Amino acid sequence: MNKLTILFLILALISVIYAQHKFPSSSEDSSSNDSNSQVTGSQSYSGSQSDSNSGSESHTINTGSSYSGSGSGSSGISGGSGSGSGSGSGSGSGSGSGSGAVSGSQSGSGAVSGSQSGSGAVSGSQSGVQTGSQSGAGSASGAFTGNPSGSQSQEINTGSSYSGSGSGAPTGAATGSGSGSGSSGTVYY
């Protein structure tokens, strides 16, 4: 009985091997050319912004405080001339009050154009590649990149600039003119 059982098992094993060799399953390829491809790895992207533009692009970023024009009230700088650290100097006109308010127009190296309100402005980083012509002044506390095929201009003020005249409480608006020097951070072009 044991010999018959062993013989039956051997025959069954041979039959299974023969069937697999003769009739491969659908998940296997009967041809001799097998190709297996595996893609492994990881991709990571860091940064706040990535730009890809065909045209022109301009960035104006103020990471400090800029005061221009005349104003009265509290929250400001009283008397004398103001100077700030960072890069940027210029003159402005208009009126503004409050903490870090910018009103009117400003021109110069590292100045802020347009109107902004609040203390401070924009800081952060951008990543990408820039081609074309670039012009900018000042330095930023971040890195700028993009991928435009046009022209770019960047104006960054990382310090403080005070100009204009003011009156009122000892904590009123700035009096006199001021310019900043130094730099904060790195700009990558």
UniProtKB/Swiss-Prot annotation:
Coiled coil: none annotated. Residues 70-101, 165-183 have a biased composition (Gly residues). Residues 1-19 form the signal peptide. The keyword Ligase does not apply. Residues 24-189 are annotated as: Disordered. Residues 25-69, 102-142 have a biased composition (Low complexity). Residues 144-157 have a biased composition (Polar residues). Keywords: Signal. This is Uncharacterized protein DDB_G0282077. It comes from Dictyostelium discoideum.
